[in-house]
Structures are given as C-alpha cells and as structure tokens.
C-alpha cells in the first residue's frame, strides 16, 4: 500500500497564513506525526483529526515550530486515553527537549520528572534505518541548520527524502537520487534573502533539472503565491492536501 503525506502546515517559522511545517505520514493503518509545532494542535483540529488517531510522533529538531505543540499533545493524551504518545527521537535531542523545552510545563513533583514519564520514548540512531511500522522505514540523516544544534532530515522507505530545516546540501540530494534511488524530495525553502540557516529558492534552482523535477517545496513564507511560476521544475506542497507517494 502506498504511503500518503498530509502536511498539517507548510509555513516557515514566522508564517501566519500557513501553519507550522508539520506533517502526517500515513502507512497503512499507522499514522506518524512528523514534528509537532506550536500550531499543530490547531491544525489537527482544523482537519478533524484527534490526537488519539496519531500512533507516534517523530521530532527532527528542537525549535518551537517543530516541538511547541508537544506539551498540549502530552496533556491531551494524559487526560484522554491515558496512553503515553510514542515519541521517536535522536538520542542527542532527548535532554535538550526535556530540560530546555518541556520540563517547565510538564514536570510535576514526585510524578513527572523526565521525558520518559510522559512519552514512550524510542531512540533513533543517525544513518541506521528503523522500522516504525510494517510499511514504514525511516532513516535519520543529519543535515546542517543551526551550528551546534542537531537537526535530522528523513529518508523514508529508501525512496523519499523529507528535509528538516537545513542549509543547501546539493551533494546529498544528488547522491540520494543517483545512488540511493530517491524518487521524491520534500524540501524546505526560503523564498527571499540570504540562506543563513535555510535553503534558498535560488540555491534550489541551481540543481539539475532531473533533481528539481522530484522536489516539492515546503516551509515557505506568506508570500508564496507570488512565486508561482518562478520555481523552475519544482512546485509547492499545499497544506492539508493528501499526497500519494
């Protein structure tokens, strides 16, 4: 059965027209939430999805537009079904996620004092594919974003690249397509300005046509519509639409 992708949001961190760049990945009867940003709970409500319909969450890196909704998710599950959400995460993100992001809101003396007390934490290792469900395999690929802050893009079922926030890595993209059989690329984009911590549209336009033709763009700013027709062989992902992969 083919995978399906539904972006809860396609916006950059400061976008207001679009929700945070988070996604639902459907693999058979398994639903994975890729990142859970500040707007994720509202986006789920908007498309009529309950947190109870999410089988697991995977976090790519620690910024508010990717983890800011985890506190609400944890509390809604705690006071709903009572089931801990399954959380897939790189080992080196566990401590900063708890200590720097979630501890203040979720900790409770004598009851909750670690990430494991509120989530069913399942560690992922960089470059080691993990079978998350019968029809879903995910490999973490570390990609540059903020110096000193780990960030992981995803290689899904040995054929789909889903970028985290990242600076331009043309060699990686070409290697995935030409050597590893990648056929779809969901890539973040910064439409204007210098790409200090993101990949710019101009950088992506420098890629060979064969690579561009496999790219759908996400994590864009509110002026996205004015760039229609100016993205070469690439197109924009639309939030809430379901894409068969």
UniProtKB/Swiss-Prot annotation:
Q: Per UniProt, what is one Pfam family of this protein?
A: Anti-Pycsar_Apyc1
* Similarity comment: Belongs to the anti-Pycsar protein Apyc1 family.
Summarize the subunit comment. Homodimer.
Q: Where does Zn(2+) 1 bind?
A: 65-66, 165, 219
Q: What is the annotated role of this protein in its UniProt record?
A: Counteracts the endogenous Pycsar antiviral defense system. Phosphodiesterase that enables metal-dependent hydrolysis of host cyclic nucleotide Pycsar defense signals such as cCMP and cUMP.
Q: From which domain of life does this come? A: Bacteria
Protein name (Swiss-Prot/TrEMBL): Anti-Pycsar protein Apyc1
What cofactor requirement does the entry state?
Answer: Zn(2+)
Cofactor-binding details, from the entry: Coordinates 2 Zn(2+) ions. One protomer coordinates the metal ions and the opposing protomer provides the catalytic residues required for cCMP hydrolysis.
Asked if the keyword Transcription belongs to this entry, the reply reads no
Q: What else is known?
A: This homolog of an antiviral immune evasion nuclease may be due to cryptic prophages, or it may play a role in regulating the endogenous antiviral defense system based on cyclic nucleotides.
UniProt xrefs under InterPro entries: Anti-Pycsar_Apyc1, Metallo-B-lactamas, RibonucZ/Hydroxyglut_hydro
Q: Where is this region: Beta-lactamase-like?
A: 19-219
Reaction catalysed by this enzyme: 3',5'-cyclic CMP + H2O = CMP + H(+); 3',5'-cyclic UMP + H2O = UMP + H(+)
List the SUPFAM superfamilies: Metallo-hydrolase/oxidoreductase
Alphabetical UniProt keywords: Hydrolase, Metal-binding, Zinc
Q: Where, by residue number, does Zn(2+) 2 bind?
A: 61, 63, 145
